[in-house]
Amino acid sequence: MKIVIVENPRPLTLEHYNDVANAPLSASLNSGYALAVASLAGWETACLDFSTSKLDEESTAAIILAEGGDIVLFHWVYSWGHEEFVRSVLEMLSRNSNVALGAFGLFPTLATRNLLQFASSLDFILAGEFEETLSELLPLFTERRTVAALPGVLLRGRSYVSRRLIADLSLLPVPDDVGANCGYTSLNIAASRGCYGACSFCFIHRYYGCSRRRVRDLASLERELETRLSRRDIASLYFIDPTFIGQGGDERERASEIGRLARRCGLPFGFETRVDGVDEELLATLAGNGATSVFLGIESGCDSVLRRIGKRISTEQIRCAVRSVQNCGIELHLGFIMFEPDSTLAELEENYLFLEELGLLDQRDQTANLLYHNQIVLYGSAAWESFGSEGRLLLDERLPFEARYRFRDERVGQVCAAMGRLTSHYFSAMTGIRQSRSAVADDCGAACHATDCGGAVNSLLKEAFLSLCRTAHTQPPQSVADLEREYAAQLHGTLALR
């Protein structure tokens, strides 16, 4: 018996040019875990990664069919309105074979029955944490040649029973390293799953069905490292846990021990954690053991917004955490929702002052990131439900799994749209400039100009944000649109776009 794991294409769109919120980073290991589970069940395995593919539907389906799988399981990551492509591929597979067609991952878990209705050729979905479900499903499929109704399996026309979370993460197999992951010199690895937070914008607790963090035995983590480091050359580690540092003294000591493990491997590492897990002494210890980067989801510089989105942290805690990272010399990456749907213009300006106070608006890429992000609303999320109940959900029949929303203050929405377009122009322009730098290494040209004008671009983005906020306070919408055009022209000129 053979299972084929498929990573679906994820085309880049202008509207979501710099968005990564369609899946948590932990999803990068999903296919590897599925393949490892199947191998333990005695199944032949194959992985087809079309994440960056530009093939058409017919060619994609032909490659999948050529593998001769008994089950084809799509790790279906939401691709910003391009779901029709996967639906077409599924229809071709269904017409030309008797293969069982399934999907798993965050997007299928959130979308569930709506996805089964959208993709009528899809036979089943593995909802939520899937490893034990798949481990139980494969032997039964070998015996019966059909997908059994099991906890964690959503079948068309059948009632669904959820599966309990895995009690001991140490029993998980070592994931295969496949697809795009093999092209990176950094190794993604998980020391825990889940998060004790319940932020309203986050999908993690929806995926697992609870706000709970589970850790694995460190001996199993060390075994996984030994196995995966023996497969290929690795330059660094990245811990993809939603929150690397847990609560309490024991969890802080555990984080320190993981740092010592990374040091014994001779590898620098990065991680993500909640603000309330940070203290400077621990960060200094981690830095001493090789920590080079940390991602903090601070999300806002307003206590009122932090309360609305259920962050359970304060701006003072954020200040302390950011300064602790800065003092330890660890590279800081930030999650920030500038345009929270209920924001006021005053809160936007408060956010700006907060970021300036902490010295976070000094580098153009980070400035562009921090001054433009709004909240992503996908089908099945808490935000979809809440905006729907308030009559604020803006649906588009072309995008059945993604929605916009009405800002409580329309002027905030105007500034958000303007900054979104300006920063999209910036990121797409910088991509082109960097590509030209790589293609013509001996021609300084635009690449050198982009480097030289970095300070000017940074100042321009900041000035645009403040000017748009001030204009939205007192002027009609047309004035905001006119101002956006002025700044777009300045941005084009500064970057020397042709």
What kind of region is each of these model predictions?
Residues 3-5, 61-70, 382-385, 390-498:
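Radical SAM enzyme core and accessory elements
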Residues 9-18, 147-191:
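N-terminal [4Fe-4S]-dependent radical SAM core
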Residues 12-15, 111-112, 197, 247-249, ...:
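Flexible glycine/acidic-rich beta-alpha junction loops that bind and position SAM and/or redox cofactors
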Residues 14-31:
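Glycine- and acidic-residue-enriched helix-capping/strand-helix junction motifs
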Residues 26, 170-332, 340, 353:
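Radical SAM [4Fe-4S] cluster-binding motif and immediate context
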Residues 30, 34-37, 44-162, 380:
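Glycine-rich beta-alpha loop elements in corrinoid/cobalamin-binding modules
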Residues 59-60, 254-260, 344-362:
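Short, electropositive alpha-helical surface patch
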Residues 112-119, 282, 342-357:
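Catalytic cores of alpha/beta
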